[in-house]
């Protein structure tokens, strides 16, 4: 019997909490490092660590359910010989699959962190509705 670890795939899906939380596993390795935060059932935040990037070198695109973040640093004119290179500033593209009705509300870039805020906006017609339970006086008397 084979066991497949699907957690690296599920971590790219925002808003599918029950599915993602039911599958534990190791954190995916990759660039850039990021966090996915949930503040309540309708608000999420993706934070990417992008030290060395400028705001003009970043691009955020939403196409259908896919949120793609791209970064392309401008090449340095100065040639540098590194004795140790621990900071990475390379081209990347990172794609997240968003759950239904989840939309990007805003994005901010400050102190080397790109924050993308997401909000779930379910149409009122699709939201659960509470039905009041009443009594019928005529039926109780019989």
From Swiss-Prot:
Transmembrane segments: none annotated. GO terms for cellular component: cytoplasm. Gene3D superfamilies: 2.60.40.790. It comes from the Bacteria. Keywords: Chaperone, Cytoplasm, Stress response. One of its GO terms (biological process) is protein stabilization. Residues 25-136 form the sHSP domain. It is found in: Cytoplasm. Pfam families: HSP20. InterPro entries: A-crystallin/Hsp20_dom, ACD_IbpA/B, HSP20-like_chaperone, HSP20_IbpB. SUPFAM superfamilies: HSP20-like chaperones. PROSITE patterns: SHSP (PS01031). Belongs to the small heat shock protein (HSP20) family. NCBIfam families: PRK11597.1 (NF008618). Associates with aggregated proteins, together with IbpA, to stabilize and protect them from irreversible denaturation and extensive proteolysis during heat shock and oxidative stress. Aggregated proteins bound to the IbpAB complex are more efficiently refolded and reactivated by the ATP-dependent chaperone systems ClpB and DnaK/DnaJ/GrpE. Its activity is ATP-independent. The N- and C-terminal flexible termini are involved in oligomerization and in the binding of non-native substrate proteins, and are essential for chaperone activity. Homodimer. Forms homomultimers of about 100-150 subunits at optimal growth temperatures. Conformation changes to oligomers at high temperatures or high ionic concentrations. The decrease in size of the multimers is accompanied by an increase in chaperone activity. This is Small heat shock protein IbpB.
